[in-house]
């Protein structure tokens, strides 16, 4: 199989800014962008599931690459207001609207006899597995959102707390249009915040990362599966801690503790009439990853 693709395009953009005050700036932008699919899509072929595991449309399934998939394009308009604290940080708010063309969609289908025959797969082995693939949406998709960003060195604290910095950012988005039902993977709410302490000999950082519940993909209608049934990834809050201690100008000890609250990764399946207590399909417990080491600067 040979697939030819080219991305020779013009991407015009316009950026303007206006100083409302010495430390208050208004910005606006109009721009175009493109999103290329994973290059593995152009290889064609398929990935088979682990036949020793239970079939699962969210993870253990047949995946088919789409060599004919196109890159999506988008037109975006954005406004932003930025306020600067003198020498110690900034806070900003922004709003945007993005209209997509040929956006990526995903679908999960049953393994039909025709599909199994096309790829030469044994029906007795693979007919119980779902088939997942990607394609370009032919319908419209619009994404609208708000953004907030804050970062500041807390110089107003007492002398014993010198070196403390705080940050927070948030993104809230919504998708509208005929193609929204086939969208997968976007997260409506993202929140990140944290605090750090920096001293000449050491530094310490604590970060919180929150992602809201997000849709993973449409599930094909089948036995006991009603229309408009989707797989979902549950909301999750991760807490990470990291730090360094310098033994000398060139050598330091470091620690990186990921997911210290041991947040679970749940996969749910829900249709219009699925009770809340019956939505949990899979629970992954990856635990907390702790890394310690020594580093040098040469």
Where are these regions (language model features)?
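Short loop/turn motifs that connect adjacent beta-strands in outer-membrane beta-barrel proteins
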Residues: 23, 88, 155-164, 250
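Signature of Gram-negative outer-membrane beta-barrel scaffolds
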Residues: 1-23, 37, 54-58
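Gram-negative outer-membrane beta-barrel transporters
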Residues: 97-99, 104, 109-111, 116-218, ...
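Flexible, surface-exposed loop regions and adjacent strand-edge segments
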Residues: 43-52, 107-117, 181-187, 212, ...
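Residues on the lipid-exposed face of transmembrane beta-strands in outer-membrane beta-barrel proteins
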Residues: 14-18, 69, 79-83, 148-152, ...
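Outer-membrane beta-barrel signature, preferentially recognizing the C-terminal barrel domain
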Residues: 5, 34-100, 121-153, 186-187, ...
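C-terminal beta-signal and adjacent terminal beta-strands/loops
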Residues: 101, 164, 212-222, 244-298
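Transmembrane beta-strands of outer-membrane beta-barrel proteins
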Residues: 26-28, 91-93, 162-168, 193, ...
């Amino acid at each position: 199989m040979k697939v030819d693709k080219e991305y020779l395009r013009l991407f015009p953009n316009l950026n303007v800014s206006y100083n409302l005050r010495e430390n208050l700036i208004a910005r606006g932008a109009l721009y175009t962008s493109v999103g290329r699919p994973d290059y593995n899509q152009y290889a064609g072929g398929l990935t088979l599931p682990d036949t020793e595991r239970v079939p699962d449309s969210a993870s253990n399934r047949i995946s088919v690459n789409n060599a004919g998939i196109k890159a999506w394009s988008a037109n975006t308009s954005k406004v932003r207001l930025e306020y600067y604290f003198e020498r110690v940080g900034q806070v900003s708010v922004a709003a945007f609207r993005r209209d997509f063309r040929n956006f990526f969609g995903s679908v999960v289908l049953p393994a039909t006899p025709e599909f199994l025959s096309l790829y030469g797969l044994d029906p007795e082995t693979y007919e119980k597995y779902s088939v997942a693939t990607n394609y370009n949406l032919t319908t419209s998709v619009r994404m609208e959102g708000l953004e907030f960003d804050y970062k500041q060195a807390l110089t107003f604290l007492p002398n014993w707390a010198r070196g403390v910095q705080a940050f927070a950012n948030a993104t809230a988005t919504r998708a509208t249009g005929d193609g929204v039902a086939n969208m997968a993977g976007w997260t409506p709410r993202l929140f990140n915040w944290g605090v750090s302490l920096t001293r000449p000999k050491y530094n310490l950082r604590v970060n919180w990362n929150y992602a809201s519940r997000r849709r993973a993909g449409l599930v094909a209608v089948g036995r006991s599966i009603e229309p408009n049934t989707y797989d979902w990834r549950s909301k999750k809050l991760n807490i990470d801690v990291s730090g360094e201690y310098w033994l000398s100008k060139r050598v330091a000890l470091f620690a990186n503790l990921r997911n210290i609250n041991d947040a679970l990764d749940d996969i749910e399946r829900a249709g219009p009439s699925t009770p809340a207590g019956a939505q949990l399909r899979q629970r992954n417990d990856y635990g907390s990853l702790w890394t310690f080491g020594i580093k040098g600067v040469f």
